[in-house]
């Protein structure tokens, strides 16, 4: 439709700049040929985001009253981030002692229990032979020390047996339990680290939650034993066991003393310094609430807590350990319990050293037995691993190897709403969950877009222009606009959300005529036929086409090696983000940039994407107004295949997102099975929306 002459003149002047804040010069400069250093960009971004979380950690706590008012909510948040809110049902442990292993000073019971039905925990219970009253008990949680022979796993309890033996020889009951991955039944810790199970992020699942729950039930078991004083329970463990010591001490106040060894450092070490690359998934909660790690430790206060580490530990570096200690010390000082917090640093690398043993033993003696005597006996391994094995044959009903499928349940398919009020309640609940649980890390106060025109040219009747804008601090992106040359407004603006293959196709076509404007891109072989087809279609339809590659694609790509790709995605995760979730934000900012140009707010916008980018476009449309149409190719039918958004499957899945989008946008699904989208179609029919709101094309 033709506009008034005044609007047409304004459009003719401004369409050439589209996103600039002033008039476009008569001759646009060529794009600077220097490409963005994607590695430097993402490193700066991670540092900025890490600093933001560090500065927020415990910043609101200035008094004991502040802390006490928030402590229970912090505990609830941690439980949620471990997948334990609500807590699983405390079912019958079905504990079984399968045998005993003898020593002159103690007996080892080889046992198993089920923390949940079918989730087996194998362990060794070390009992002093000499006992006349209930004794203090230690839960010893093991690190990543596999014990395996001829394809048979004896569990990491065999590797760490010397700790249980020492405690039993000194008046403690000690339960040493296997971990999920390195137990006699070998489950999975390395879901994202090794097996590309990025859907764990959608589910809000982490194996840290399984380890924490197993610890809770291990305390239940210890308290059921007549040999144990239920009010004197300690926890310790090293490396992975140090991490699990933090989980259980923070969430379960039955722990009266804790010594996590080599089990904590801060986000600066993990994200900026790269320690994440040496850790598996069991080390991390799903950081929905964007904590730094001192907040994991602080809930232990004011109970006796010893942070123990070596000075040359490469995956728990000394500087981060000390920073964590200093933050936690603030909370202990609020309680006037400075003496209940200790920091032990010994010489050495990431290794189970005798120096680390001694202080842990003394700490437990002091706080659980009121015994300040010197340590006279060292910790020794007395048994061969097979002597500590629990199962002769592994149970057929075990769920350990697949527990990641069920531990955090996905939301069931919801009912089709009966009326508009019911639908509004459902939709608003999903949107709130997305804002608070999936996209919480989006900038609350985003920076100015800082539009900049970086190149423009007219050839073959079309104008091609390049623009840079800020998605958020440190993330500067480039978008390209192609449109028929002339004064008229476009009939619509088609925003293409590009993955690597789609970007390659676009570059191959448009470099035929606009290679100079594409400098800074890695250009493929030119495709003259594709260029001809694109130009003819664009001119015939009188459309403007905008191409946006979100962060990490094209000019902003970082190290393409598989390892670095995995570890950068894990960095996002540690910051309470996902790469896909922040790409949704990038698309939102691109849409805002288009809308910001004079004369464009009322021009219909269509979003195009394929595969995961179709899902990213879909979610962007839920938070940006007036998206006329979504053209989505190969949209994943569920989130298991992307996009990966924190916690999303705890609340909804792709069909519900499509239903929400269909309320305000026409959706065209390319190459889709209509049966996969029956929920969205049923919502449309039930609420009397336009039948064309959801269309299928092959």
Question: Whereabouts are the PLM-identified features?
Answer:
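Conserved alpha/beta-hydrolase
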Residues: 166-184, 539-557
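Alpha/beta-hydrolase
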Residues: 139-142, 177-179, 261, 495-498, ...
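Primarily recognizes the serine-hydrolase "nucleophile elbow" in alpha/beta-hydrolase
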Residues: 217-289, 590-663
